[in-house]
């Protein structure tokens, strides 16, 4: 991360935007979940966000402008049976975002920190999910069918829906927003 940051600062004369967007979901009962799977999710979903923030705040302070956008999930807002480990990581991203937003504000650092919480989005994360994990014994894994049954709008979200939210939070259009959760889920959390 430090090397990536240095190359960005060299190439662009500063660092103004960080988007932390990495995640894996390993479902299953907390009783049978392997410690290695717990730690792998923590490392990718939460430690990665921490490291991005840690290494990118100093050059943002120097640039006198910054926006950090962390990708969480609706699973960071509401629990799901057999996704406890994933819930923990995405809930951690949610509260890390709020804590860092307040730290930046209290120190008068010119950095906004916000999170995006996608719902059921048409991405490869669903390809490796076990249907039983998603809806306690359900036999569906088809994303569109799942969205139709679970999401109030009955629609599946698409990566562009999330990208537009991230773009908004990274832009000056959201200059007065920090510590905010942007939920893009077709009403799933309503």
Question: Can you name each region flagged by the protein language model?
Answer:
Residues 29-30, 37-42, 68, 147:
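Substrate-binding pocket helix/loop in short-chain dehydrogenase/reductase
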Residues 31, 78-84, 154, 172:
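Active-site loop immediately N-terminal to the catalytic Tyr-X3-Lys motif
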Residues 53, 89, 97:
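Active-site helix of classical SDR
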Residues 58, 102-106, 175:
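Alpha-helical segment proximal to the catalytic Tyr-Lys
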Residues 73:
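Residue(s) in the substrate-gating loop at a strand-loop-helix junction
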Residues 105, 110-112, 177-179:
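Short, small/polar-rich loop/turn modules that mediate ligand/substrate recognition or access, typified
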Residues 115, 138-173, 177, 186:
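C-terminal helical subdomain
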């Amino acid at each position: 991360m430090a090397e990536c940051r240095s190359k960005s600062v060299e190439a662009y004369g500063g660092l103004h935007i960080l988007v932390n967007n990495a995640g894996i979901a390993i479902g299953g009962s907390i009783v049978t979940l392997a410690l290695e799977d717990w730690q792998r999710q923590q490392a990718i979903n939460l430690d990665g966000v921490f490291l991005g923030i840690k290494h990118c705040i100093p050059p943002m302070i120097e640039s006198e402008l910054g926006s950090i956008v962390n990708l969480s999930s609706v699973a960071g807002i509401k629990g799901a049976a057999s996704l406890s480990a994933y819930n923990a990581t995405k809930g951690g991203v949610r509260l890390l975002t709020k804590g860092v937003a307040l730290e930046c504000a209290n120190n008068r650092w010119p950095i906004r920190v916000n999170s995006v919480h996608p719902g059921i989005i048409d991405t490869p994360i669903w390809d490796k999910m076990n249907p039983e994990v998603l809806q306690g014994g359900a036999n569906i894994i088809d994303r569109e069918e799942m969205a139709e049954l679970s999401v109030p709008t009955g629609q599946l979200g698409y990566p562009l829906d999330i990208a537009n939210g991230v773009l908004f939070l990274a832009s000056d259009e959201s200059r007065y927003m920090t510590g905010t959760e942007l939920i893009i889920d077709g009403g799933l959390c309503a």
